[in-house]
Curated annotation (Swiss-Prot):
Pfam families xrefs: HbpS-like (PF03928)
Protein name, UniProt field: UPF0303 protein Avin_29320
Family: Belongs to the UPF0303 family.
InterPro entries: PduO/GlcC-like (IPR005624), PduO/GlcC-like_sf (IPR038084), YBR137W-like (IPR010371)
Length: 166
């Protein structure tokens, strides 16, 4: 994994995966898309979508545990505070050789700079909410969200996906 390359690609994802509008119906469509991907691949994930602190979609697939929802909450807190994907925040901290505690005094009980939460971005407005997935390795959580967003926004996934680690 090349940190700089991944951070550059995530910045591109955040620039291109933006909505013109987003409401409760949009949250349902996005959440349903994520759930369908999880069902097709037999993934045990929790999905949470919120806008302005209001939970609009929550789903826990078979095989998940309450801990998955807590991880989603902690990743969501990072995105809400930093206005960047939780994976980008974590990779930047890794690159800088620091942590959330050292950099911002944030308690790990409430914040997790791990992949799996992406800002819901409105063009011309910025971050209005989050979409979180928990249950897979962090890179996979992040990529699943990007895949669902790219499909919904009719963006070319091959231009946005992170490089394959294999």
């Amino acid at each position: 994994m090349n940190l700089d390359k991944d951070l550059e690609r995530i910045a591109l994802q955040e620039a291109r995966l933006q909505f013109r509008s987003f409401d409760a119906h949009s949250a349902w469509v996005l959440g349903s898309r994520l759930r369908a991907l999880a069902e097709q691949r037999n993934l045990a994930i929790t999905i949470e979508i919120q806008v302005n602190g209001n939970p609009l979609f929550l789903s826990a697939m078979p095989g998940t545990a309450p801990n998955n929802l807590d991880w989603a909450r902690r990743k969501k807190n990072v995105v809400t505070l930093m206005r960047r994907s939780s994976y980008a925040v974590g990779l930047q901290l890794q690159k800088d050789g620091t942590s959330l505690i050292e950099q911002a005094g944030l308690e790990l009980r409430d914040y997790a700079a791990h992949g799996g939460c992406f800002p819901i971005l409105l063009r011309g407005t910025g971050c209005i909410g989050t979409v979180a997935v928990s249950g897979l390795p962090q890179r996979d959580d992040h990529e699943l969200i990007v895949e669902a967003l790219a499909g919904m926004l009719e963006e070319r996934l091959e231009e946005l996906a992170l490089d394959n680690l294999a």
